[in-house]
Structure formats: structure tokens, C-alpha cells
């Protein structure tokens, strides 16, 4: 197992990546909005193509996209998970899920599978010693579809906004365009390897960095545009019936003040516009951010059991989305 003991240094690095990335860039003030507007960012769009899969021979695979910021990246602490669950369960997560593969690029190549498709285990998070929602997703999906291959394409940018970074002026922004190249690169690889690969759902865990009053006021319109771009640009890879958008609400952490209620209300309102938009409240689900590390909690990220539960919830709604297609 690759996971090592957690050190305060790694935790600080992860926290800085996820919550302070935008604050570390040069900015200019905008008199019109009252916002401190970040300078444009440049993304690395070099996505390698190692040949890591056998010929698919027409095998049908469900493809799920996992997008967002640090709680999608994976900053829940593996060591605490080990202490909070049965040893046999932890061993199962550590050994991984051979039928659920992941290809990931996190924080502009800060952590990456280097274009390879790996089985999901506890080593696919922001850094060594952290895990993300893909673990809970794989747990649920491997049980629901024991005879099928599931593929997760995970692309995240910790600490960055929908308003300025995934989008820019309501149009496709730097992160979006880099993500799109990532998705197209590996969907084309799967198809070229003779897999019948189709995207059935997008799981979105984002919004914590949009909780100023100005950005929150624009979140509904931004998300409407964002999902429209996703469905249009990925339409050639879409599952029969289209692509579901499964949206997790953000926490009520102090880091999400003042406008976490407005962000979550925007997400909920968006979900009501189509049966293919699904929203769930992480607050109502009881997910927590205040317990770990013990004595000095990382208020920005889900505690270990909550990080696992976040993935379970995503997995359950993915299953619901396929059930609605009659599968």
C-alpha cells in the first residue's frame, strides 16, 4: 500500500492548495463588482497517452466524470479512515476495485495517473495520505454492476472558482478548456481501443470558492451555462438519453461563509430545471468538516467518513440515473 502516515507539512500543503490557490495569484480590484479579480491562469494541457488497457473487443463501459475543487480532488485523511472503520473494510479499500478504473489529473498535474487507467483505491487523492470521493463511488458501483467495467475520469482544480476560472465572463474558461481536452483525449483513447464507452453522468463537487456575495449571485447563471457547455461539447460521447449532472451541495464551514446558503439554493434551483439535473445536500446528509485532524480540524475538507459518504452518495445517484434509462 502506497499510503504513508500524515505529517503536518503535507496537511498544510494540501490546505494551501485547496483553499488559498486563488489568493496566491496577483489580482486587481474591480470597482464595479467589489471583487478582487484574479489574473488569468494558464493550464497545462499535455495529456500523455500510454497504452495501459487491453483491446476492449466491443465491451460496453460506463464512464463517469468527477469534476470540481478540493473536496472532489480528495483531501480526506486516509489514516483517520483506517481508525474509523473495520480493518477488513479498510483492507478492501486499500486493495482497490479492479472493475472500477480511474484516470485522473488533479490541480493542473500536481497529482496524476499520467494518462494511465488504474483501479480505484486510496491513493488517488490530492497527495499521499489523502483520498477522494472516487473510493465511495467505486464501492457502490462495483456492487451494483459486478459484471461491468466502470471508468471514472477525474479532473479537478482545488481552490478555484466557477465564475472566474472554469468559466470566464460566462464563456468557457481556462480550466474548462483544459478539462475538455483531458476528457476528449481519454474518451478517444477508449473508443480507439474498441471499448463501447459512453459518458452517463458528471459528478460536480464545487462552489466553496464562489461564496462571496458577488460570485454567489451569479452561480445559477454560471452553472446553467457551464452544464450547457458540458452537454454540448461532450454530446458525441453521451450515453443514450444524455448526460446526467449530479451536483453536491457545499458545506456550512466557516470557509464557505457568507454565501454557502445562496450557492446551495442556486444548485437546488438548477436541479429543478430538468430531471437530468440532480442535487443533494451534504449538510442534510450529515457530512462533517470539523473533526479531523483531531484538535486542529481542517474546516475546508470533509472528515474521512464524510469523504467516503460523499462518494457513496454520488454512487447512489449514478445508479439512479442509469435506472431511469431502464438499465
What are these regions (language model features)?
Residues 25-27:
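Bacterial signal peptide processing site
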Residues 34-327:
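Cell-envelope and extracellular/periplasmic
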Residues 2-10:
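Bacterial N-terminal signal peptides that target proteins for export
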Residues 10-18:
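Bacterial N-terminal signal peptides
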Residues 20-23:
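C-terminal motif of bacterial Sec signal peptides marking the signal peptidase cleavage site
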Amino acid at each position: 500500500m502506497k499510503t504513508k502516515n500524515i505529517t503536518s507539512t503535507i496537511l498544510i500543503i494540501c490546505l494551501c492548495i485547496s483553499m488559498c490557490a486563488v489568493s496566491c495569484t496577483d489580482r486587481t480590484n474591480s470597482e464595479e463588482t467589489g471583487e478582487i479579480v484574479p489574473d488569468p491562469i494558464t493550464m497545462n494541457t499535455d495529456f500523455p497517452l500510454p497504452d495501459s488497457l487491453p483491446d476492449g473487443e466491443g465491451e460496453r463501459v460506463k464512464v463517469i466524470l468527477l469534476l470540481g475543487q478540493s473536496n472532489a480532488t480528495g483531501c480526506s485523511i486516509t489514516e483517520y479512515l483506517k481508525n474509523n472503520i473495520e480493518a477488513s473494510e479498510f483492507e478492501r479499500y486499500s486493495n482497490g476495485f479492479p472493475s472500477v478504473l480511474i484516470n485522473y489529473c488533479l490541480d493542473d498535474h500536481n497529482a496524476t495517473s499520467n494518462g494511465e487507467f488504474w483501479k480505484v483505491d486510496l491513493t488517488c487523492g490530492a497527495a499521499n495520505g489523502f483520498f477522494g470521493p472516487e473510493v465511495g463511488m467505486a464501492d457502490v458501483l462495483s456492487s451494483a454492476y459486478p459484471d461491468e467495467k466502470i471508468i471514472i475520469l477525474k479532473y479537478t482544480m482545488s481552490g478555484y472558482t466557477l465564475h472566474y476560472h472554469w468559466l470566464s465572463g460566462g464563456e468557457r474558461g481556462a480550466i474548462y478548456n483544459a478539462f475538455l481536452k483531458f476528457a476528449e483525449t481519454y474518451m478517444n483513447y477508449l473508443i480507439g481501443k474498441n471499448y463501447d464507452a459512453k459518458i452517463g453522468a458528471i459528478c460536480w463537487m464545487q462552489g466553496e470558492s464562489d461564496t462571496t456575495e458577488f460570485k454567489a449571485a451569479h452561480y445559477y447563471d454560471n452553472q446553467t451555462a457551464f452544464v450547457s457547455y458540458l452537454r454540448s461539447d461532450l454530446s458525441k460521447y453521451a450515453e443514450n438519453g444524455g448526460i446526467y449532472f449530479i451536483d453536491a451541495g457545499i458545506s456550512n464551514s466557516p470557509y464557505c461563509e457568507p454565501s454557502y446558503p445562496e450557492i446551495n439554493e442556486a444548485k437546488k434551483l438548477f436541479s429543478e430545471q430538468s430531471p437530468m439535473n440532480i442535487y443533494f445536500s451534504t449538510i442534510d446528509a450529515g457530512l462533517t468538516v470539523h473533526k479531523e485532524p483531531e484538535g486542529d480540524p481542517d474546516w475546508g475538507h470533509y472528515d474521512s467518513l464524510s469523504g467516503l459518504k460523499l462518494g457513496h452518495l454520488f454512487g447512489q445517484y449514478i445508479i439512479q440515473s442509469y435506472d431511469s434509462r431502464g438499465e
